[in-house]
Regions:
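Sec-exported extracytoplasmic/periplasmic mature domains
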Residues: 88-99, 104-112, 188-193, 241-250, ...
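Solvent-exposed loop/turn segments at secondary-structure junctions
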Residues: 106-112, 174-178, 209-213, 251-252, ...
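Active-site-adjacent structural elements in enzyme catalytic domains
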Residues: 6-12, 22-25, 34-36, 58, ...
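Second-shell residues forming the walls of enzyme active-site clefts
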Residues: 188-194, 229, 274-443, 447-452, ...
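Glycine-rich tight-turn/loop motif centered on a GG-T
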Residues: 170-174, 217-232, 263-282, 319-339, ...
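C-terminal non-catalytic regions of proteins with extracellular/luminal or membrane-system context
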Residues: 1-61, 67, 122-148, 152-155, ...
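Hydrophobic faces of well-ordered beta-strands that scaffold small-molecule active sites
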Residues: 104, 147-149, 168-172, 201-207, ...
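Acidic/polar loop patches that form or flank catalytic/metal-binding clefts of enzymes
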Residues: 355-358, 402-409, 440-443, 460-466, ...
Length: 785
């Protein structure tokens, strides 16, 4: 590698001229052999220019990045012009293969080291292949845990397929500096490859929401409902924004603002709950915090990708649309989309959210649904996945609701979630999605299929130009085009400066997220110094390994003893005595963590929200359809659930009290828990990085060191009658229909349920009714004072 020596004293004297690229490859060398330290040129009243293999144009004493090494100051290189002019002109200069690559994101970008030191050789030089995986000819395709989605991610995505973005899956323990270096390498590769025939576009790292210790999403909803304001949301987002930007994580694949309405849906746990007003308030503060203001993108922004438009909550009886078995959204209730599901998206659009992600699913337009309108407009008539629906992502989102960003599909929509477009070829699917209004498509690197779509006439060139323009415009607005490079040391500094404060705020948020729902005879808080017997109960989580690999796993595994010891240590630190026999205890404390069988990527039965141990349920055609196979499958949502009653009887027989915490990731049926306990709290957190905070916070509440303020964010189901599934003939087809509508939140379901069914429910409601006469409906929660 040849590095040109630059005399910056002489450079400053140049009024008009050209500065060649600071680095030049020599014969036999490849760009991925080196980590190049960027060279910077400071404009006194303009942006800094950062380059590695691009030259710099000097005009009127100002520096401009020569993004194609042509020597011409084209409008897209001229930072004095407005963003729109530059983005439009850049599109005009892109070759077709780079335009195609600009549409795509890879899914599994994972740095190969944890620290900068790990990425060095024995001489202290950075080895790119220790950070960014290098393409190896003939290497077999990694086995995919996501059917139809490639797990292969290496530098060929950039150097061959012309992509300029990927989803960062780095371990949270990886240093911020290492993340920044990964970003810099991606940008370096794009810059070099573009200068051989294209345009240097910044490399973008998307990331799913990364928990830095705050409660999981339902817990956030519970906390703000208790607060009565959304202050903690803005502070969380603003702090996270600073750390993300410094580390090169420029785009958030979130937040998820779906409203939870079907009780069996496994992704209820990823929502902020079921109350549209609460989710709307949360998304407003998230946009303000992450995008650094209320007026759209700016140089301090992280791009938000609000999902899953127009709301995935009304799933068909809990089946999830990552797989064909769950491809339908149902709207049996007139006006439900406008009343419940679209308000959070409207709130996001009003705050100028910069991107949306459509859901995988498609609306059922047969007798299972009623036509849905928004502001007088019929929302959808075509039974295709939302990414393919012009009615939804252009006519509704843009024309009616005022969205003005870019549309980023979820991953796999051209290979797996091809609902309604099964008969189209892959190039035709790309064409339909892009022409419908989708600008970015996730999870693929097959840019050649987009090229083919244009060349074979399926995709009008102007539609591809529009998609590229919208994506590039966001890059110009956040100020990443002229100097996309990052300072790894600064990334570590920013994380260090912000992380301690974030940890403290996150712990307080966990305290606020604890919900006290039962306090019979004021059994709580627990008497200081008392003897406590602890037992942990957990279900079998078939999706834990997959979730863990995606960076969204759950803590604790199946080892209840490890969890018991962790909780015991927290009680002991507050002066309590832990005993080994329930009969010796003044209090039995039960930590109850049910696990859903409703996996996203392996669905073999209807999701179960009862607390069951080795109970048989009807099997379905796994992932393919809801058709019953005639076989039965064993499901355990809570091991040894019957032991709860046994422990309760033993403790009560000796004059003791029973207190429990239920981990709520779905609206569990509590008939095998609540009747046997004197005190009951809810907490909503299962992610590993936040589990310690969640456990500490719940012990703070149980001990009386924190007065609980949290409110239920997800109405708990009263009995199986209110969610009973019956078969009915609809439009000549036998369908399974839920007793309560799939599209209405739990707090509002009673008005739509047959009164005869409600009469069979304890308390006469969809909401769970406890022994003390309280309904576990969204918004309910007790305090000590």
């Amino acid at each position: 590698m040849k590095k040109r020596e630059l005399n910056f004293a002489e450079i400053k004297a140049i009024k008009d001229g050209y500065i060649p690229a600071p680095y030049v490859l020599e014969e036999g060398e490849q760009i991925n052999d080196f980590y190049l330290e960027p060279v910077y040129f400071e404009n006194e009243d303009g942006p800094t220019i950062g380059v590695t293999t691009c030259g710099v144009i000097v005009k009127d004493g100002l520096f401009f990045k020569d993004m194609d090494n042509s020597g011409e100051l084209a409008p897209y290189k001229d930072w004095r012009l407005d963003h729109e002019t530059r983005a439009k002109d850049m599109v005009a200069h892109l070759p077709l293969n780079q335009q195609a690559g600009l549409v795509l994101n890879t899914l599994w970008n994972t740095p190969l080291s944890m620290t900068v030191d790990e990425a060095k050789d024995e001489n202290g030089n950075i080895v790119p292949a220790k950070i960014f995986k290098r393409f190896v000819e003939g290497e077999p395709e990694p086995k995919s845990i996501l059917p139809g989605v490639s797990m292969r991610v290496d530098d060929s995505d950039i150097l061959v397929h012309k992509l300029a973005a990927g989803v960062y899956r780095g371990d949270m323990r990886a240093s911020a500096a290492l993340s920044a270096m990964y970003h810099n390498l991606g940008t370096q590769y794009v810059e070099y490859e573009a200068c051989q025939g294209g345009v240097a576009i910044p490399y973008s790292m998307h990331t799913n929401p990364i928990n830095i210790g705050y409660p999981d999403f339902l817990g956030v909803g519970a906390a703000v409902m208790g607060d009565g304001n959304f202050d903690l949301i803005y502070n969380m987002a603003d702090t996270d924004r600073k750390m993300m930007k410094a580390a090169g994580q420029n785009i958030m694949y979130g937040p998820q603002v779906d409203i939870a309405t079907d009780p069996r849906w496994p992704r209820n746990s990823g929502t902020y709950g079921e109350v549209p007003e609460i989710t709307s308030g949360i998304i407003k503060e998230l946009v303000r915090g992450y995008q650094n203001g209320e007026d759209g993108l700016n140089e301090g922004s992280v791009v938000l990708t609000v999902k899953h438009f127009p709301g995935d909550g009304p799933a068909e009886n809990g089946f999830e649309p990552h797989m064909p078995i769950g491809q339908w959204r149902l709207y049996p209730t007139e006006g439900s989309m406008e009343k419940y599901h679209l308000p959070p998206f409207q709130a996001a659009f009003d705050m100028k959210a910069s991107s949306i992600m459509p859901d995988y699913s498609r609306v059922a337009t047969d007798g299972r649904s009623t036509p849905q309108y928004y502001r007088g407009k019929l929302t959808s008539t075509e039974e295709v996945g939302s990414t393919y629906s012009k009615e939804l992502i252009t006519d509704l989102a843009r024309d009616v609701m005022g969205f003005d960003g870019y549309v980023n599909s979820d991953s796999g929509i051209t290979t797996v979630q091809i609902y309604g477009v099964e008969d189209l070829t892959v190039p035709q699917r790309y064409a339909k999605a892009i022409s419908a209004g989708t600008d970015v498509i996730g999870g693929n690197s097959d840019s050649e299929n987009i090229v083919k779509a244009v060349e074979e006439g399926y995709l009008p060139k102007e539609d591809l130009d529009r998609a590229n323009y919208r994506r590039l415009l966001s890059l110009f607005k956040v100020g990443r085009v002229d100097n996309p490079y990052l300072d790894p040391d600064y990334a570590d500094k920013v994380r260090k400066e912000n992380f301690e404060g974030a940890k403290k705020a996150a712990y307080v948020a966990n305290q606020k997220a604890v919900v006290l729902v039962k306090n019979h005879d004021n059994v709580l808080p627990m008497k200081k110094g008392a003897k406590i017997y602890i037992e942990c109960f957990k279900g079998i989580d078939p999706g834990a390994a997959l979730a863990q690999s995606m960076g969204a796993g759950v803590a604790g595994g199946d080892d209840n003893e490890v969890l018991r010891k962790q909780i015991a240590a927290l009680f002991e630190a507050k002066g309590y005595t832990i005993v080994e026999k329930a009969e010796e205890a003044e209090y039995a404390y039960l930590h109850v963590w049910p696990c859903s069988n409703g996996m996203v990527f392996y669905q073999y039965a209807m999701p179960v929200i009862e607390m069951v141990d080795n109970q048989l349920f009807e099997a379905r055609e796994a992932n393919k359809s809801q058709k019953k196979t005639g076989e039965m499958v064993s499901i355990t949502t809570l091991k040894d659930v019957d032991k709860i009653k046994t422990i309760s009887e033993a403790v009560h027989a000796n004059g003791g009290k029973v207190v429990a915490t239920c981990v709520v990731c779905n609206p569990w049926l509590l008939d095998k828990l609540e009747p046997y306990v004197d005190g009951l709290t809810f907490q909503y957190t299962i992610s590993p990085v936040a589990m310690g905070n969640a456990l500490g916070a719940q012990v703070d509440v149980l001990s009386g060191d924190y007065n609980p303020t949290g409110k239920i964010s997800l109405t708990m189901v009263s009995c199986m009658d209110v969610i009973e599934i019956t078969e009915k003939e609809i439009d000549g087809v036998m369908r399974e229909v839920c007793a309560s509508p799939n599209d209405v939140p739990g707090y509002d379901k009673d008005q739509y349920i047959d009164p005869a069914i409600l009469a069979r429910a304890k308390g006469g409601s969809y909401a769970y009714y406890d022994a003390d006469g309280n309904y576990y409906r969204a918004g309910f929660g007790l305090s000590y004072k």
